[in-house]
């Protein structure tokens, strides 16, 4: 893209699976494009360190940002700390095709500044309850792609998966969503295809 690498924001509540999604996308894409990751944590760099431990990307391609206070501010109202990390990565790796920007855990109102992210993925957790899609919120309703994670847990937490998907369709309108089990890799291929289709991400053929 003319302004540099595709920048993809990954948001969602604490524990929904944002870091798992980031890890799975790195595993699927690192050998097919030049990519990097920025993680946002309030007071630590735990998510960045978790990705380094998983060895899905070289450590120098991962930046951990400590947002302090409200993590929502660092991706929306004042994204300067994240924009500085983007600029730093672009200087270090001029050939970058993709930067994933993982937000700190936040509520259903979290959204990314258009200045920071070209596309937004929003992750929700099936185990959080049957009524999550009905609560809407900008992240859930208006993100470019909604990822309904941990669908395998539905029978264990009293969630009717068919009804959950119906409510998700209603909340999303024409916007796409994926029913996923990210730890098992289910749904990752659909998310990659979305990034290619909607983000214009150019990938090398799979080996």
Swiss-Prot record:
Keyword flag Nucleotide-binding: yes
Entry GO MF terms: GTP binding; GTPase activity; nickel cation binding
Subcellular localization(s) per the UniProt record: Cytoplasm
Predominant location category: cytoplasm
Binding site for GTP: 12-19
Keywords (A to Z) from UniProt: Chaperone, Cytoplasm, GTP-binding, Nickel insertion, Nucleotide-binding
Any one cellular-component term (Gene Ontology): cytoplasm
UniProt keyword Ion transport, yes or no: no
Gene3D superfamilies, per database record: P-loop containing nucleotide triphosphate hydrolases (3.40.50.300)
Range of residues in the leader sequence: none
Any one GO biological process: urea catabolic process
Function field: Facilitates the functional incorporation of the urease nickel metallocenter. This process requires GTP hydrolysis, probably effectuated by UreG.
Protein family: Belongs to the SIMIBI class G3E GTPase family. UreG subfamily.
Known partners and oligomeric status: Homodimer. UreD, UreF and UreG form a complex that acts as a GTP-hydrolysis-dependent molecular chaperone, activating the urease apoprotein by helping to assemble the nickel containing metallocenter of UreC. The UreE protein probably delivers the nickel.
Protein name per the record: Urease accessory protein UreG
Species whose genome carries this gene: Cereibacter sphaeroides (strain ATCC 17025 / ATH 2.4.3) (Rhodobacter sphaeroides)
């Amino acid at each position: 893209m003319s302004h540099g690498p595709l920048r993809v924001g990954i948001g969602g509540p604490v524990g929904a699976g944002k870091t798992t999604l980031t890890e799975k996308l790195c595993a699927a894409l690192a050998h097919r494009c030049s990519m990097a990751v920025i993680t946002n944590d309030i007071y630590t760099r735990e998510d960045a360190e978790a990705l380094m431990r998983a060895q899905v990307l070289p450590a120098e391609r991962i930046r951990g940002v400590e947002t302090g206070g409200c993590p929502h501010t660092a991706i929306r109202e004042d994204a300067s700390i994240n924009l500085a990390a983007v600029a730093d990565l672009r200087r270090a790796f001029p050939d970058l095709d993709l930067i994933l920007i993982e937000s700190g855990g936040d509520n259903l109102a979290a959204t990314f500044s258009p200045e920071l992210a070209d596309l937004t993925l929003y992750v929700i957790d099936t185990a959080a309850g049957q009524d999550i899609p009905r609560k809407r919120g900008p992240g859930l309703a208006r993100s470019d792609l909604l990822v309904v994670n941990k669908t395998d847990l539905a029978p264990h937490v009293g969630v009717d998966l068919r009804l959950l998907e119906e409510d998700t369709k209603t909340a999303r309108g024409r916007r796409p969503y994926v029913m996923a089990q990210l730890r098992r890799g289910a749904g990752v291929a659909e998310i990659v295809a979305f990034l290619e289709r909607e983000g214009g991400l150019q990938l090398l053929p799979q080996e």
